[in-house]
Amino acid sequence: VDSDIDPGYREIKGRRWRISDPSIPEPLRQQLVNELMSARRAVAAANRTSNAIALRTARRRVQSAKTALGERGPKWWRPMNDQEWTVRATATLFSLLNNRQANASLCPSEVARASDGRHWRKRMPDVRLLAEEMTHTARLCITCRGEPVSISTRGPVRLARGERFDDYFSGENDA
């Protein structure tokens, strides 16, 4: 594979492998890699115990982390349309939050930077809209100073786990 022609792949031992998006800031990339490794360990553990539900959940976590890293899903080296960006941003949001402690939150700009590094500023309104949609399913909670608020709240907001956060990985209530 000629990386000048197809920059999203690298050939290793004769096989093409999709590489991570190099525009993801290093601290966020590392968090996503940590989530991917944790999810892979969860797949192995579920396989050892023959737990089908845990296996499905762990595989969804792997898919989400790989999509957030740009290794699956929309091709990061090509311009993404809004639908493709939403797929990647959703995976990024849930993977970053899942990698953090249960009571932790993240800044909307972290989602924007990791999901569309080159154009993250223009994606900020999109992240806020995506977050608002996730509050309707209780998968996400928008907070300011630790208190739930509306997305229309002026000033800095944070994104935290909602009551049904885990439904994203379990597949419950998939639309």
Positions of predicted regions on the chain:
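Non-transmembrane amphipathic alpha-helical segments
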Residues: R29-A46, A65
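Short acidic, hydrophobic short linear motifs in intrinsically disordered regions
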Residues: N103-A114
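Short, cationic-aromatic polyanion-contact patches
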Residues: R145-G171
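Amphipathic alpha-helical coiled-coil segments
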Residues: S64-P79
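Positively charged, polyanion-binding regions of nucleic-acid-associated proteins
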Residues: W85-S105, D126, L130-H136
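A short, conserved structural fragment
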Residues: T135-C144
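Short acidic, Pro/Gly- and aromatic-enriched capping/linker segments at domain boundaries
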Residues: V1-Y9
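Short helix-coil junctions and helix-kink-helix linkers
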Residues: A112-M124
